Amino acid sequence: MKYFFASDIHGSSFYTKKYKESNASKLVLLGDLLYHGPRNDLPKDYCPKEVFAMLNECKDDIIAVRGNCDSEVDQMVLDFPMQSDYCIGVFNDIYFFITHGHIYGEDHLPQLAKGSAFIYGHVHLPIAKKSGDIYILNPGSASLPKEQNPNSYAILDDDIFTIYDFDGNVLKEIKLEKNI
């Protein structure tokens, strides 16, 4: 199964459209979906109404967690749950701890089993690495990247986690082994 991971859309309709083009089976949203937050500039094509309409069209394919810019008001317009701070899923036989990153992060990991993947957003940086027995993954920011990185998203296809820019260039890639 093919999974599309996106974080920190921040209301950008331009970057939300990429999921439909990907032919992925599931869309995993790592928070900060609609609002840009008081510290960020407006992202390209900022239109939260268009974003929630597009996301609601594929609500049955979405797994989502809450980001620090997401609110109860956002949940009122979304037809899928996104108020949990984290969720645990199994994708292609690998355990994933999915969170935004404002509570748990690379420097504050939850207890994870050997071979698990910790995937988060929040820092707006693309990351794909192994740290000890845990995979640390971050698709980067779809709309407001930091440190001169391009706008990005990730695809998990079989056991390969690949981070792409929106021109289709591979930024980072890692093979996830089931039992490290």
Give each language-model segment a name.
Residues 2-91:
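Core catalytic region of metal-dependent phosphoesterases/phosphodiesterases
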Residues 2-10, 94-102, 135-140:
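Active-site-proximal beta-strand elements of phosphoester/diester hydrolases
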Residues 7-13, 69-71, 101-105, 124, ...:
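Short beta->alpha connector loops
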Residues 26, 96, 116-117:
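Short, Asp-centered acidic motifs that coordinate Mg2+ and/or phosphate
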Residues 37, 41-42, 144-146, 176-180:
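Active-site-proximal loop/helix segment associated with metal-binding centers of metalloenzymes
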Residues 39-41, 74-78, 84, 108-109, ...:
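Short, well-ordered secondary-structure micro-motifs
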Residues 91-92, 131:
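Structural motif
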Residues 102-172:
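Conserved beta-sheet core of the metallophosphoesterase superfamily
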